């Protein structure tokens, strides 16, 4: 259905619709050596790659990028192309599943419109904004909770 997980959620903070994303699907893996180790055998490409990815992903990747043939039939140029595509996988996401399914969002009340000490609106005295309603983005891992508590505490000192 699409891509998800911590890395994709983190990238989504910076991605704009229509932007291309480049992903190294095998960081730290010398795929050229891995494929060449299987060259003496009739191991299908899909089976070599399945050691690194879920089977459905591997099958779909081969379907879209390179037919799964025995690696002993691959030329050096073929192997280099496969390596390049997996270490520099380029895609343009078609979009998201929308706000209803979002795990992260961006936007909100501009921090320049608030007192950083009190979280009070500079335009409307007595109006305070805290937590996820403020345009503050952090790394995954509970930072949104910390921001909610800290900004709530700051505002609470002045309400």
Task: For each feature predicted by the language model, list its residue ranges.
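Gly/Ser/Thr-rich beta-alpha loop segments that engage phosphate groups in nucleotides
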Residues: 4-7, 109-110, 133, 140-144
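Predominant activation on well-ordered alpha-helical scaffold segments within soluble catalytic domains
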Residues: 8, 83, 87, 149-157
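Tryptophan-centered motif/residue detector
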Residues: 15, 61, 89, 147-149
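A conserved FAD-binding loop/helix module that cradles the flavin
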Residues: 136-159
């Amino acid at each position: 259905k699409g891509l998800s997980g911590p890395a994709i959620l983190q990238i989504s903070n910076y991605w704009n619709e229509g932007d291309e994303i480049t992903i190294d699907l095998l960081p730290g893996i010398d795929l050229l050596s891995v494929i060449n180790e299987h060259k003496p055998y009739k191991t299908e490409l899909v089976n070599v790659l399945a050691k690194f990815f879920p089977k459905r992903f591997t099958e779909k990747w081969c379907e879209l990028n390179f037919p799964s043939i025995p690696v002993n039939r691959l030329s050096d140029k073929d192997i280099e192309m496969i390596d390049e595509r997996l270490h520099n996988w380029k895609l343009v996401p078609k979009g998201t599943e929308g706000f209803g399914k979002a795990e992260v969002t961006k936007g909100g009340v501009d921090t320049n419109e608030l007192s950083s000490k009190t979280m009070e609106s500079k335009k409307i005295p007595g109006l305070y904004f805290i937590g996820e309603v403020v345009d503050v983005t952090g790394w995954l891992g509970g930072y949104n909770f910390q921001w909610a508590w800290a900004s709530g505490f700051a505002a609470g000192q002045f309400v």
